[in-house]
Swiss-Prot record:
Keywords: Aminoacyl-tRNA synthetase, ATP-binding, Chloroplast, Ligase, Metal-binding, Mitochondrion, Nucleotide-binding, Plastid, Protein biosynthesis, RNA-binding, Transit peptide, tRNA-binding, Zinc
Protein name, per record: Probable alanine--tRNA ligase, chloroplastic/mitochondrial
Targeting signal (transit peptide) range: 1-54
Annotated cofactor note: Binds 1 zinc ion per subunit.
One Pfam family here: tRNA_SAD
InterPro entries on file: aa-tRNA-synth_II/BPL/LPL, Ala-tRNA-lgiase_IIc, Ala-tRNA-ligase_IIc_anticod-bd, Ala-tRNA-synth_IIc_core, Ala-tRNA-synth_IIc_N, Ala-tRNA_ligase, Ala_tRNA_ligase_euk/bac, Ala_tRNA_synth_plant
Family per similarity comment: Belongs to the class-II aminoacyl-tRNA synthetase family.
Compositional bias segments (type: Polar residues): 73-85
EC number, as in UniProt: 6.1.1.7
Length: 976
């Protein structure tokens, strides 16, 4: 019996019909047949997935049948090639709807929907999540067992390699959503191509005659599938080179040939000479990567264990197509943010100039990016991911400033108001963004205000540099661009944007050179790693194969440990003696190797034949496989293969252990007092003290520090028991254990729990009961970088030692000041008042002396035109007194006075200028300009108003010449 919706024909009739069908019509028949086959496969999938009740199965079957019937109708309608699939009409083409339809399409085909991964990837080779496949990279590489055969996601991504094109082209972004479907050793090319075509032309209703396909030039298999199975005409299949159609997630890792789908906005231009790179005609919207290879660090490519599928569809691009707008920015994913920025600038986007639209697009795109990045715990800084946040946000601020955007009434910054729109649109992509609203808005406000403080000065300096470059007909030097970056916080791309607007080029190579020089200088003091030894240890780890066993959680000594390797002088040796410095690898050790912020143990190794080694540091090597004991041979000689007893310094371990547990309590206390947004940025648990770095946008008050300290000591006095347990990372997350943001964890983790107080992932050593810590005292709190604070503290015996040190200081002060300890504060306060009074008296006397010296100079004033000019030098006079002297001289000289005074104090130079209004008018002179030139001659700078200016310099040897030039300038201008 024939299937509903299809005609039945005998074999002869079919043969006769085929002979009369044109090649084009025959290809359309193939397309229709492919779609029906795909729908039939989908029906089978739905039948398999319908595992519920009989009613549920019946519903699934009915749904599948309806889809097949709809597909039959749709293919008949589309055979004209003149319009999109009417079956897709009336469906939700909003960004939210497209996202939902994509995910449901693949869920119906056996894919498990997975949440978006963080923008901070576990992969150390990639700074930010740039593709949907990154969270599955270990599965693709065979490093982790697959949890499911198929998956589908919507992944938030950030890429900044095309930042200069943001707002310029129709579809470049820093932040975007990547819709994807993935197969882990399950289906491969044929199914991926068929489903991609069905999704595009049936679910989304794209006209199939407007869809083009590209394949890797050597991928004949993919070409054949598109042509023979899917039915795409050869004229709309393009073979492309490796740079276009061979995809990789990063410099290393899974990769493979890919096939891309393009939408044709202008089919009337014909097939001949069509260029898929022509952005005015085509937009690439779907990329299918046939992930079957792996690229290692050396660039070698090898087959993966399984053949996998990794796809990506740009949500913004599909929204542009389905919503019928001219660019991605005008879709409902970004346009509301742009409209908010435009309204704050008093503009209507539709009537804006091209430049204004570009600026608004930058604001819309970058605001999305920083909103999601801050939500994922990335705060503005000058390094790594933090610099990307700072760079993007400062571009938002600058473009907002150019548009005239002002903060809303009662607010000090405008970026939070714009970000609120991005946050309100984020829930389906990432529900955490709304929950992190307070963190996001606070960081945006803090960073915007910080940038505003230097933006004005930086813009002035950049304007001066550009004018000089124009006058000299040269570009902006890399050194100057770096000064703007280093001193004023100007990202390089802002400098290049402003310079480009003025037609000036920037020396990018010079900038990179200056940046490299600064890095090398800052790193020089920290280069203590023995690279030779490191290479030797890595080789040892490879040769041994086995891992060192750490038994130090329960033991501080080992009676029998075998010496597996000895490294001395950067080489693996069989024996070492006579005070040699060595690195020793044991098979079993109680020594804790430095990690997680806790320092390595100290102690001794003893051999049966009398050798003694003093261990001063312990580190991991060989990717963490071996534990290396850095030691000095104190007595005898140590041999490879010998047996030793290993003994940890119990007192040092106790102190490190106390400090480590105290850091856990400290983090919990900070979260309780300052809020849950506080997160660890680093730590050091040493023998003498602890250090804890944390993300916090504001300074911590003394009252808050006292509250934190009191909380920690209260928990110590509660004598709470600690537990340490290994468990799957999923279980740890479910329990709510605190994890250090950005840290890479394995599948099994160790959870240290102080019930009701603290629960963290940690591999360090800890007390068994909080009472063992004894006490806790904060020594200092300060900011160490933008948005990062540092607390230094002591615990246990360190508290007693600190009190003893401070007691000794108090006794010494009491003795020196000859007062009891309790009266020290009042005595010091009185001395401070006396000192201030004495300083004021000294300043007054210096001023009087300067005036007296200046009075003697009145007679030296020159009459130039109708003005009275006095340029003189008064050494040893501070800036305040120099100003008083200049004002006194100007008063005595009266109308037409022009006074410039200079003073040398060691190598430093002080300058001051006062010009009467007549001088300013007659000579067209400004005090700030004249004095600025003099200061520059002295290696400094400064300026001021037309009538008054102050400046300084660092080269007193040039003061006379600078004053002579100033006098010449005045004389020339006024002698008319």
């Amino acid at each position: 019996m024939p299937r509903p919706g299809f005609a039945h024909a005998t074999a002869p009739a079919l043969a006769h019909a085929r002979a009369r069908i044109s090649p084009v019509a025959r290809r359309r028949v193939v397309v229709m047949r492919t779609r029906v086959d795909g729908a039939a496969k989908s029906l089978v999938t739905q039948l398999r997935l319908a595992l519920g009740s009989t009613a549920s199965r019946a519903s699934s079957i009915a749904s599948a049948r309806r889809r097949v019937r709809a597909l039959g109708t749709a293919t008949n309608d589309q055979s004209t090639g003149t319009r999109a699939n009417p079956n897709a009409e009336g469906k939700d083409n909003s960004g939210r709807g497209i996202r939902r339809r994509f995910l449901e399409f693949y869920e119906a085909r056996g894919h498990s929907r997975q949440p978006s991964a963080s923008l901070v990837p576990e992969d150390p080779t990639v700074l930010l999540t740039i593709a949907g496949m990154l969270q599955f990279k270990p599965v693709f590489m065979g490093q982790r067992e697959r949890e499911m055969p198929r998956a589908t996601t919507t992944q938030k991504c950030v890429r900044t390699n095309d930042i200069e094109n943001v707002g310029v082209t129709a579809r470049h972004h820093t932040f975007f959503e990547m819709l994807g479907n993935f197969s882990f050793g399950d289906y491969f090319k044929r199914e991926a191509c068929e489903w991609a075509w069905e999704l595009a032309t049936n679910e989304f209703g794209l006209n199939p005659e407007r869809v083009w396909v590209s394949v890797f030039r050597e991928d004949d298999e993919a070409f054949a599938i598109w042509r023979d199975v899917v039915g795409v005409p050869e004229s709309r299949i393009k073979r492309m080179d490796e740079k276009d159609n061979f995809w990789a997630a990063g410099p290393t890792g899974p990769c493979g040939p890919c096939s891309e789908l393009y939408y044709d906005f202008h089919p009337e231009r014909g097939l001949d000479g069509a260029d898929l790179d022509d952005d005015s005609r085509f937009i690439e919207f779907y990329n299918l990567v046939f992930m079957e290879l792996n690229r290692d660090a050396d660039g070698g490519i090898k087959p993966l264990k399984n053949k996998n599928i990794d796809t990506g569809m740009g949500l913004e691009r599909m929204a542009q197509i389905l919503q019928g707008v001219s660019n991605n920015y005008e879709t409902d994913l970004i346009r509301p943010i742009i409209d908010k920025a435009a309204s704050m600038a008093g503009l209507d986007y539709a009537s804006c100039s091209a430049t204004q639209k570009q600026q608004l697009k930058v604001i819309g795109d970058h605001t999305r990016a920083v909103t999601y990045m801050i939500s994922d715990g990335v705060f503005a800084s000058n390094i790594g991911r933090g610099y990307i946040v700072r760079r993007l946000l400062r571009r938002v601020v600058r473009n907002g400033r150019l548009l005239g955007i002002k903060p809303a009434d009662g607010q000090s910054a405008f970026t939070p108001s714009i970000a609120e729109v991005a946050i309100s649109m984020s829930e389906e992509c990432d529900p955490q963004v709304v929950k992190n609203t307070a963190r996001i808005l606070a960081e945006l406000e803090r960073e915007e205000l910080s940038f505003q403080k230097t933006l004005g000065r930086g813009e002035e300096m950049l304007a001066e540099l550009i004018e000089k470059a124009k006058d000299s007909k040269s570009g902006l030097s890399g050194k100057d661009a770096f000064t703007l970056y280093d001193t004023y916080g100007f990202p390089l791309d802002i400098t290049t944007d402003v310079a480009s607007e003025a037609g000036i080029a920037v020396d990018l190579e010079g900038f990179e050179k200056a940046m490299a020089e600064q890095r090398s200088m800052s790193q020089a003091a920290h280069q203590t790693v023995d690279v030779t030894a490191g290479n030797a240890l890595a080789q040892v780890a490879d040769e041994l194969g086995a891992m060192s066993e750490f038994i130090g959680y329960d033991n501080i000594s080992s009676d029998v440990s075998n010496v597996l390797a000895i490294v001395s002088g950067g080489e693996s040796v069989e024996e070492a003696s006579g005070g040699a410095r060595v690195d020793v690898v044991l098979d079993v050790t109680p020594f804790y190797a430095e990690s997680g912020g806790q320092v390595g143990d100290n102690g001794f190794l003893h051999s049966a034949d009398g050798a003694v080694l003093k261990v001063t540091d312990v580190q991991k090597a060989g990717g963490g496989r071996i534990i290396v004991h850095s030691a000095t041979v104190v007595k005898g000689s140590i041999k490879k293969g010998s047996q030793v007893s290993a003994n940890v310094d119990e007192n040092a371990r106790r102190r490190a252990r106390n400090n480590h547990t105290a850091t856990h309590l400290l983090q919990s206390a900070l979260k309780k007092v300052l809020g849950d947004d506080v997160s660890q940025a680093g730590s050091l648990c040493g023998f003498d003290r602890l250090r804890f770095d944390f993300n916090c946008p504001k300074a911590v008050t003394e009252a808050q520090l006292l509250e934190v300290e009191t909380l920690v000591n209260g928990w110590i006095s509660q004598s709470a028991d600690l537990t340490a347990e290994e468990m799957p990372i999923a279980a740890a997350k479910e329990k709510g254990a605190t994890m250090m943001f950005g840290e890479k964890y394995g599948d099994v983790v160790r959870v240290v729990d102080v019930p009701g107080i603290s629960m963290e992932l940690c591999g360090g050593t800890h007390v068994s009961n909080t009472a063992e810590i004894g006490g806790f005292k904060i020594i200092s709190e300060a900011g160490i970088a933008s948005g990062i604070r540092r607390i230094e503290a002591v615990a246990g015996a360190g508290v007693v030692e600190l009190l003893q040190q401070r007691d000794a200081v108090v006794k010494q002060l009491a003795s020196t000041l000859r007062v009891p300890p309790e009266e020290i504060a009042s005595r010091v306060s009185g001395m401070q008042k006396d000192l201030v009074a004495a300083q004021k008296l000294a300043e007054s006397l210096r001023g009087e002396l300067a005036v007296a010296k200046a009075n003697a100079l009145v007679s030296e004033a020159r009459a130039v035109g109708e003005s009275k000019v006095l340029v003189a030098r008064l050494d040893g006079v501070d800036p305040g007194a120099l100003k008083v002297a200049a004002e006194n001289l100007a008063t005595q000289l009266g109308d037409g006075a022009a006074v410039i005074l200079g003073s040398a104090n060691g190598d430093n130079v002080g300058l001051v200028a006062l010009f009467d209004t007549k001088v300013q008018k007659d000579g067209d002179l400004k005090a700030g300009q004249v004095l600025g030139a003099a200061a520059k001659r002295c290696g400094g700078g400064g300026g001021g108003k037309p009538g008054f200016a102050q400046a300084g310099g660092r080269d007193a040897t040039q003061l006379d010449a600078a004053l002579d030039e100033a006098l010449q300038t005045l004389t020339t201008a006024l002698d008319k």
